[in-house]
């Protein structure tokens, strides 16, 4: 995840008078903005936000930028990363503190997360925001939203939990937490409607950002690769746990592909310094030729654009690969205990896991999950794309149609919906 970055100075609260104890959340300084004074002139609107990972940080930054167009003097505070800070949000805690996933991982970090949540909600209540916006991270954000809503603060949940995939009854719990749910995918609002939740499809900001026609040659030039090269992008995740579980398997699969395609170039983008160190260790013990493997800082989208095929973990990255129109193979493993619990309880409602497959209701990308996620099977699936260009060409119009369905000027629509909630008016999105 992103680092703490530049910290803003603020009112002394005693938070930094001592070093935090083990497990205690690391607070960033509070806003300069004074608390509103009863009877004083109307102050600018105040928005508090929480984004728990890199994708949420980007969504938050886009929303902040659009809200500033409507409210130039608005104030923004919360939990976020570099993108939200760049958009003008004063972060009290960094988004990286919430970057855990899976049942066993969450349990290990639970005491620290509970302390952080308690510290944040007390602080934000004192700051008195007009609207609180929880971005993704439902297990962390929804209790905060419910707590603040009970105290009279309007609440928004941006990015619906995957209620279409598992635990649909979460929609009922969201009804008591959020006044408004902003959905990225069109299949989500109808599910919420069954549970009486005000949910709006705003589109996906990533679909707005990415051109319909991707420029592979420009991406390769950026990375110093020949236009005639055969390129595989390998993205085993943006979290330490994901990379630990998938990195060696993915790199072994890449080596097997190299055995069939000797001139293959393998791009391995690292989300941050910690991920880069772990990936470098995995590359050093892999069989990949040094001259054919390229560990790069960030630039995941550029790596996908440059690639002929992408091997990646299930998640938002699959949507990005679809939007840049690249064939992909999806692999994923969770901690064994997490997998056994999910299977035992029958929590998963879908037969597909990759977002392009779910959106299309079709098998556009091979999915190799858990025990099926092994180097030999991943290699076979990758070679199937590389050796059948007609199959790749047939995929393009399917991807293009999905791209168009998601391209809705999402940040502007989300900001308009939040503005409607703030001003106490209905919003249908019809005029956006």
From Swiss-Prot:
InterPro entries from the UniProt entry: Glyco_trans_19
Chain segments carrying region Disordered: 1-35
GO cellular component: membrane
Keyword field: Glycosyltransferase, Lipid A biosynthesis, Lipid biosynthesis, Lipid metabolism, Transferase
UniProt keyword annotation of Disulfide bond present: no
HAMAP family registered for this protein in UniProt: LpxB
Highest taxon, organism lineage: Bacteria
Phylogenetic classification of the source organism: Bacteria, Pseudomonadati, Pseudomonadota, Gammaproteobacteria, Lysobacterales
Protein name (record): Lipid-A-disaccharide synthase
Molecular-function annotations in GO: lipid-A-disaccharide synthase activity; phospholipid binding
Cross-referenced CDD domains: Glycosyltransferase_GTB-type
Entry keyword Transferase: yes
Role this protein plays: Condensation of UDP-2,3-diacylglucosamine and 2,3-diacylglucosamine-1-phosphate to form lipid A disaccharide, a precursor of lipid A, a phosphorylated glycolipid that anchors the lipopolysaccharide to the outer membrane of the cell.
PANTHER family recorded: LIPID-A-DISACCHARIDE SYNTHASE, LIPID-A-DISACCHARIDE SYNTHASE, MITOCHONDRIAL-RELATED
EC number: 2.4.1.182
Record's catalysed reaction(s): a lipid X + a UDP-2-N,3-O-bis[(3R)-3-hydroxyacyl]-alpha-D-glucosamine = a lipid A disaccharide + UDP + H(+)
Transmembrane spans: none
Pathway entry: Bacterial outer membrane biogenesis; LPS lipid A biosynthesis
A GO BP annotation: lipid A biosynthetic process
């Amino acid at each position: 995840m992103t680092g703490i970055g530049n910290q803003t100075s603020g009112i002394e609260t005693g938070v930094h008078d001592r070093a935090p104890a083990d497990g205690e959340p690391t607070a960033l300084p509070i806003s300069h903005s004074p608390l509103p004074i009863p009877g004083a002139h109307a102050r600018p609107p105040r928005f508090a936000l929480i984004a728990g990972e890199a994708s949420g940080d980007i969504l938050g930054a886009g929303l902040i930028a659009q809200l500033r167009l409507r409210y130039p003097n608005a104030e923004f505070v919360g939990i976020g990363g570099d993108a939200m800070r760049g958009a003008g949000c004063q972060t009290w805690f960094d988004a990286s503190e919430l970057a855990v996933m899976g049942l066993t991982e969450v349990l290990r970090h639970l005491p620290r997360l509970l302390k952080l949540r308690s510290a944040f909600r007390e602080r934000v209540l004192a700051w008195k925001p007009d609207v609180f916006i929880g971005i993704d991270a439902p297990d962390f954000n929804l209790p905060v939203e419910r707590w603040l809503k009970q105290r009279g603060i309007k609440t928004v949940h941006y990015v619906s939990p995957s209620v279409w995939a598992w635990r649909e009854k979460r929609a009922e719990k969201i009804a008591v937490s959020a006044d408004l749910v902003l959905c990225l995918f069109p299949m989500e609002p109808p599910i919420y409607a069954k549970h009486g939740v005000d949910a709006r499809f705003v589109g996906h900001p990533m679909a707005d950002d990415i051109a319909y026609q991707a420029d592979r040659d420009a991406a390769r030039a950026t990375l110093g690769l020949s236009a005639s090269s055969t390129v595989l992008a390998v993205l085993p995740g943006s979290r330490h746990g994901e990379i630990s579980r998938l990195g060696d398997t993915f790199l072994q699969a890449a080596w097997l592909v190299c055995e069939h395609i000797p001139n293959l170039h393998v791009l391995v983008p690292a989300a941050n310094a910690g991920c880069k160190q772990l990936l470098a260790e995995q590359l050093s013990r892999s069989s990949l030729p040094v001259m054919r493997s390229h560990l790069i800082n960030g630039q995941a989208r550029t790596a996908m654009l440059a690639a002929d095929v992408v091997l990646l973990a299930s998640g938002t990255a699959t949507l990005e690969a679809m939007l840049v129109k690249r064939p992909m193979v999806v692999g994923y493993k969770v901690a064994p205990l997490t997998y056994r619990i999910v299977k035992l309880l029958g929590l998963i409602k879908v037969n597909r896991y990759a977002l392009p497959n779910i959106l299309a209701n079709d098998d556009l990308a091979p999915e190799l999950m858990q025990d099926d996620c092994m180097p030999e099977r991943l290699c076979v699936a990758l070679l199937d794309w590389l050796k059948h260009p007609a199959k790749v060409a047939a995929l393009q119009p399917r991807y293009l149609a999905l791209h168009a369905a998601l391209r809705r000027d999402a940040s502007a629509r989300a900001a308009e919906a939040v503005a409607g909630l703030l001003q106490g008016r209905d919003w249908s999105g019809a005029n956006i």
